[in-house]
Design a protein with these regions (language model features):
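Short, surface-exposed linear patches
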Residues: 28-30, 82-85, 113-114, 141-146
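Alpha-helical substrate-recognition element adjacent to the catalytic core
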Residues: 2-99
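Acidic, Mg2+-coordinating phosphoryl-transfer loop and its flanking beta/alpha structural elements
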Residues: 109, 115-146
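A structural signal for short coil/turn segments at secondary-structure junctions
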Residues: 55-57, 113-116
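Short loop-to-alpha-helix "cap/lid" segments that border enzyme active sites
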Residues: 101-111
Length: 146
């Protein structure tokens, strides 16, 4: 039987990145945008759902557009929010990969997540919500009102 899995986006879904969005206005400053992510407050409602899925024996997949070089920072942030490494599998953007989030996540889904039965996704990006709907995956829109 295929293992049931749930996909969680990170920025804007599990973490509230609003305090660093100003780095993406005008000339995009990705360096500072990513370097400040450790300050993101958790989005508690989404974390409750992650823990619920984990306790229901669903595989937790964190699928993020964050670059691989921020893996340790991301793992530490998750640990600070009581998500231990044994609780999830995380897929990140390869270093020097500049493809769109939708292209990245579609590729990872089709090449690395095909062994799972993905039953739900939590996402804040409208284009990715559409992608998961096209894949017949139930999606919860986690976008915050700005």
């Amino acid at each position: 039987m295929t293992e049931k899995a749930v996909i969680f986006d990170l920025d804007g879904t599990l973490s509230d990145r609003r305090h660093r969005l100003h780095y993406l206005e005008g000339q995009k400053d990705w360096k500072n945008f990513f370097e400040q992510m450790y300050l993101d407050p958790p989005i508690k409602e989404t974390f409750k759902k992650l823990f619920r899925h984990y306790h229901n024996n669903h595989k937790i997949i964190i699928l993020t557009g964050r670059p691989e070089e921020f893996r340790d920072t991301t793992i530490n942030w998750l640990k600070e929010n009581n998500v231990e490494t044994h609780m999830y599998k995380m897929f990140m953007r390869e270093s020097k990969n500049y493809e769109s989030d939708i292209s990245l996540k579609r590729r990872i889904f089709e090449t690395k997540l095909n062994r799972y039965s993905v039953i739900k996704a939590y996402e804040d990006n409208a284009d990715l919500i559409k992608l998961w709907n096209e894949k017949n995956i139930e999606v919860e829109d986690c976008s915050l009102d700005l």
